[in-house]
From Swiss-Prot:
This is CTP synthase. It comes from Chlamydia muridarum (strain MoPn / Nigg). The keyword Metal-binding applies. The gene is pyrG. Pfam families: CTP_synth_N, GATase. Pathway: Pyrimidine metabolism; CTP biosynthesis via de novo pathway; CTP from UDP: step 2/2. Keywords: ATP-binding, Glutamine amidotransferase, Ligase, Magnesium, Metal-binding, Nucleotide-binding, Pyrimidine biosynthesis. Residues 294-532 form the Glutamine amidotransferase type-1 domain. InterPro entries: Class_I_gatase-like, CTP_synthase, CTP_synthase_N, GATASE, GATase1_CTP_Synthase, P-loop_NTPase. Signal peptide: none annotated. GO terms for molecular function: ATP binding; CTP synthase activity; glutaminase activity; identical protein binding; metal ion binding. Belongs to the CTP synthase family.
Length: 536
């Protein structure tokens, strides 16, 4: 086999941070001069997360080629330079759909279609297709869910078969939780032992055990895990809870020397690892002595911390070149204290979303920011809120609205895109990377320093072309358009320090080492506003 495979599974509890671990391993392996590809296998039966409620699943991350994916792919992007595509993700829904389609097309020659071998073979096909497309030295495969979940069994069986076929080219990392009982002042290894026993009963003996814990594990505890889980002591690693930032994870794993172990098992020669640049970024990010900037996030899914994951991370990245500390203030659009909360902030960000709930609150937030000259950044639905607000209160069209929110509005300044009126919801939006032509002498051009960019999209609605001339004649600047059809991509509000809306999702391109320029300029404007107000 021309590539090496690392399979990452999780046990004991969910939300262990497998995605962050996989992303961190990718960064460390890249620093060793290896080309890395990544694949996330999700056991849920949805074809993709595109129609899933953000309260259940968190945000939907979109790749350049227009695939709606799990938010873990966002971690992969932010930590490493891996190329992500439709080959970087698969769900049980996709796997079963392919198997059933093949059966309907007669490709199984009348055989009884079963989980083994037909479903497992399809999973193996996904792994091989990812490797063939990206041609990596190392392919990291994260298996979603927790060992013991019935949904994961076909994926684990496929992993077992794949490892049997390529024993010298595969490694299994099992990530577990090792609880610390404060009352007894004891670290308990039994849950890890049981999780590994469960995994071994399926036919997979882990090569590495990565123990997530609240406190550092002693050599004695590692020896105990080694003994009862049948792995060498030097294959037991500790991922202690991070103190300040998720971006400390590569530094933690580097201190554990886990990559040296993996490379030696694969027959690679480890190189000296220099993470000085990453350490400097993390140190700056965690520096609390910079001027504090408070950004109000006006969104409807605030109860789920992962619903706006990429937005949160993009703001965090931008705080480094903007040279400020950051506090993100969640503000409900339905709150009666909306304007009072915004008055305490240095900037307002209105993120993407769907549906009528909270819509009027987002428009109210946009109006308050425009009236009070507060920096404001609207993304996707947020941009549409800026346009509707401007139409209502600057153009004196009081009933102006989006057709998504009011199908009977007399002034539909936001309308459905041509060809989007479909009953099928999954995977039918305008998805993926599209070009955007930027007008010189604009806030957007000042940020990008170029007149043509590629940004990722996820939407059905657009600024109504029938109202573009009226909006522009009354001052609204359309400074970014898609050359393919002149779709409005970026708007700027006139006579304002910094008020900008984008139809795309810039948060999907930001990295710690390469913050997105629009977020940097937004935070810089918020910092200037804060300093002018004399805020501490």
């Amino acid at each position: 086999m021309s590539f090496k495979s690392i399979f990452l599974t999780g046990g004991v509890v969910s939300s262990l941070g497998k995605g962050l671990t996989a992303a961190s391993l990718a960064l460390l392996l890249e620093r060793q001069g290896l080309k890395v590809a990544m694949l996330k296998l999700d056991p849920y039966l949805n074809v993709d997360p595109g129609t899933m409620n953000p309260y259940e699943h968190g945000e939907v991350y979109v790749t350049d080629d227009g695939v709606e994916t799990d938010l873990d792919l966002g971690h992969y992007h932010r930590f490493s330079s891996v190329q992500l595509s439709k080959h970087s993700t698969a769900t049980s829904g996709q796997i079963y759909t392919r198997v059933i389609t093949k059966e309907r097309n007669g490709e199984f020659l009348g055989s009884t279609v079963q989980v083994i071998p037909h479903v497992t073979n399809e999973i193996i096909n996904v792994i091989q297709a990812c490797a063939e497309h990206h041609k990596p030295d190392v392919l990291i495969i994260e298996i979603g869910g927790t060992i013991g979940d019935i949904e994961s069994l076909p994926f684990l069986e496929a992993v077992r078969q794949f490892r049997c076929e390529h024993p010298q080219d595969c490694l299994s990392i099992h990530m577990t939780y090792v609880p610390y009982l404060k009352s007894a002042k004891e670290i308990k290894t039994k849950p890890t032992q049981h999780s590994v026993q469960n995994l071994r009963s399926i036919g997979i003996s882990p090569d590495v055990i990565l123990c997530r814990s609240e406190v550092s594990l002693s050599s004695e505890v590692k020896r105990k895990i080694s003994l009862f889980c049948n792995v060498p002591e030097n294959a037991v690693f500790n991922a202690i809870d991070l103190e300040n930032s998720i971006y400390e994870m590569p530094l933690l794993l580097a201190r554990e020397n886990i990559v040296d172990f993996l490379l030696s098992k694969f027959g690679f020669s480890p190189k000296s690892l220099d993470l000085t640049d990453w350490q400097n970024l993390v140190t700056t990010l965690c520096d609390g002595n910079r001027h504090l900037v408070r950004i109000g996030l006006v969104g409807k899914y605030l109860e789920h911390k992962d619903a706006y994951k990429s937005v949160f991370e993009s703001l965090s990245h931008a705080s480094i070149p903007a040279n400020c500390s950051l506090e993100i203030v969640p503000i409900s659009p339905e709150s009666e204290a909306l304007t009072n909360q915004l008055s305490q902030c240095d900037g307002c960000l209105i993120p993407g979303g769907f549906g009528t709930r909270s819509w009027e609150g987002k428009i109210a937030a946009a109006r308050y920011c425009r009236d009070n000259n507060i920096p404001c950044f609207g993304i996707c639905l947020g941009m549409q809120a800026l346009v509707v607000e401007y139409a209502r209160y600057a153009l004196s069209l009081p009933l102006a609205n989006s057709l998504e929110m009011d199908p009977n509005t007399p002034d539909p300044v936001v309308c459905m895109m041509q060809g989007q009126d479909t009953m099928i919801k999954g995977g039918t939006m305008r998805l993926g990377a599209y070009p955007c032509q930027i007008t010189p002498k604009s806030l957007a051009f000042e940020a990008y320093k170029t007149d043509l960019v590629q940004e990722r999209h996820r939407h059905r609605y657009e600024v109504n072309p029938a109202y573009v001339d009226l909006l522009q004649k009354n001052g609204l600047r359309i400074v970014g358009v898609c050359p393919q059809g002149d779709l409005c991509e970026i708007i700027e509000i006139p006579n304002h320090r910094w008020m900008l809306g984008v139809q795309f999702h810039p948060e999907f391109l930001s990295k710690l080492a390469a913050p997105h320029p629009l977020f940097v300029k937004f935070l810089s404007a918020a910092l200037d506003y804060s300093l002018e107000k004399g805020r501490e």
